[in-house]
Amino acid sequence: HLERLNHSLSGIALTSPHSEAALLEMLLALVQKNGGGNLGVYLQITRGPTMKRQHAFPEHCQPTVFAYTFPISEPSDGSTDTASCFTAVTKPDKRWERCHIKSTALLGNVLHMMEAVEEGAEEVLLFNDREELTEAAACNVFIVSSGAVLTPELDHQILPGVTRRQCIELLQRYTDWTIETRPVHLE
């Protein structure tokens, strides 16, 4: 588990504030303080608190380590008398296809933003597998070209931003520019 944790932390450019040995020692102490026995342990390491909400990694931020225990049932001996069953359904994996839902799950956006920052940019424009513009890491996108304002159509890949809607309403009310919501291609 700790090896997988460190692999995941490395994948998001986050360094654990503790060695594996120190984490293991802390987790064992937590289990002891909670009476031992059949306990599960939940461990989470975050980048840490910051006073400014931003998509780029905050500087000078200390990672937060959070852990708790919870009771788990006795392990089954494998016999049919103690084995338990459950039902399951199958669904397409849509975990990364829900950009239109406002949530705190910003990992994809944050990782894209860090790539932009590392390349000296302030934002990143994101394209789907059809080379159509979706949005930027931290905002919706508008392109002004030849007296028209282009913005991608809303779909499951785009968060319907409040500012996006207000910009469209203001442009319609106060300008004679054409507003086109349509696919915007990379070329």
Across the structure, where does each feature detected by a protein language model lie?
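Conserved alpha/beta cores of soluble small-molecule-handling proteins
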Residues: 1-125, 129-132, 169-187
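Conserved catalytic-core subdomain
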Residues: 133, 138-187
